[in-house]
Amino acid sequence: MSDITVANYHAFPDARGHFGRYGGRFVAETLIGPLQELAQAYDAARHDPDFIAAYNKDLKDYVGRPSPIYHAERLSRKVGGAQILLKREDLNHTGAHKINNTIGQALLAARMGKTRIIAETGAGQHGVASATVAARLGLECVVYMGATDIERQQINVYRMKLLGATVVPVTSGSATLKDALNEAMRDWVTHVGHTFYIIGTVAGPDPYPRMVRDFNAIVGREARAQMIEDYGRLPDAMTACVGGGSNAIGLFHAFLNDASVRIYGAEAAGDGIATGRHAASIVAGRPGVLHGNRTYVICDDDGQILETHSVSAGLDYPGVGPEHAFLADSGRVQYVGIRDEEALAAFHLLAHTEGILAALESSHAVAHAMTLARDLPKDALVLCNLSGRGDKDVHTIAAREGVRV
């Protein structure tokens, strides 16, 4: 990691959409115009009090915000050490943080006069959230999803269809999130006149990384205020899972300038970094270009993107949002790899001690929160973003454990 001094983390990205040496717009010429149109529309909307009021009203009345911070007392006692606090994004409408972003982008799509939205999805939560807001606003919705992910997330596939969306299986490459994003990009280029592409993570070409971050930043703003109100101080440490990194940057952003708060991103180490079967782009990747932005990617010596693995479909992605790459290089956020078996153990322990089924993605963060707690005193506070609920993963976990459901 390079030696970077940053006075204000909220000053990024710059006017060209760069977070230090990461980000930007590495796209075909045919997409430059649509991206400029989108950036102009977003910049106008985010300064429009009426748009902000409509967004905030939907967060309150439709999503059900604010989400609470829950003190996992029995889990904390079982683990030993610090107190583990959970930011309960799993309690949102549709069951994850994803709807914070899709509400904002769908309102922007309607403002721009678009009649059709498309989305990519891995675990299916972003697809469900996109289909949900499309139904509410009367927009056509098409969701691209890797065939591998369709097999392991059939409940969410059916949920999308119930909401009126068309789910398009993607069989190219590893048939996972990366490939779904590729197909969605191709669709957007072809139908840009009436189509709005709702990217689900803080990746892609500018303005997507900053736009998705801004729509998810409500998580961190709420958490900061809740910590001060309920505990009289900020947490000592916090963690969130990182695939593309939308839930993580949503939590982290409000705390980036608070030097007293240690921040950790939990990437998917899969079967272990040494095996090569993982999706830990920062821990084990290198700088490169993927899906329109410069960031950390998992690739070979020739820059070719490699296949990834994670028990969690939502973390099974060979890149990461460019702001995370920048935060890693600056040293502000530390990124660690959590193996499948560690995430599964955390899933079960949280279920047994607190009666909460966490998404497998979120379980990576819970696993690291437990590790952090063990090394801290009893009065320390560790905040963990519980980004989604685990109903969607029950079949996957049962199959791994030889249980027929």
UniProtKB/Swiss-Prot annotation:
Q: Provide the catalytic activity annotation.
A: (1S,2R)-1-C-(indol-3-yl)glycerol 3-phosphate + L-serine = D-glyceraldehyde 3-phosphate + L-tryptophan + H2O
Provide the E.C. number(s) assigned to this enzyme. Answer: 4.2.1.20
Q: Which gene encodes it?
A: trpB
Cofactor or coenzyme needed: pyridoxal 5'-phosphate
The taxonomy runs: Bacteria, Pseudomonadati, Pseudomonadota, Gammaproteobacteria, Lysobacterales
State the family named in the UniProt similarity comment for this chain.
Answer: Belongs to the TrpB family.
- Describe the protein's quaternary organization and the partners it interacts with: Tetramer of two alpha and two beta chains.
Key words, A-Z: Amino-acid biosynthesis, Aromatic amino acid biosynthesis, Lyase, Pyridoxal phosphate, Tryptophan biosynthesis
Per its record, how is this protein called by name?
Tryptophan synthase beta chain
Function, as annotated: The beta subunit is responsible for the synthesis of L-tryptophan from indole and L-serine.
**Pathway(s) the chain acts in:** Amino-acid biosynthesis; L-tryptophan biosynthesis; L-tryptophan from chorismate: step 5/5
Q: What class of enzyme is it?
A: lyase
GO function terms (MF aspect): tryptophan synthase activity
Q: Name one Pfam family in it.
A: PALP
- Residues bearing PTM N6-(pyridoxal phosphate)lysine: 98
Q: Name one GO cellular component term.
A: cytoplasm
| CDD domains according to UniProt | Trp-synth_B
Q: Which InterPro entries match?
A: Trp_synth_b_CS, Trp_synth_beta, Trp_synth_beta/beta-like, TrpB-like_PALP, TrpB-like_PALP_sf
- Keyword Iron-sulfur in record: no
Superkingdom in the source lineage: Bacteria
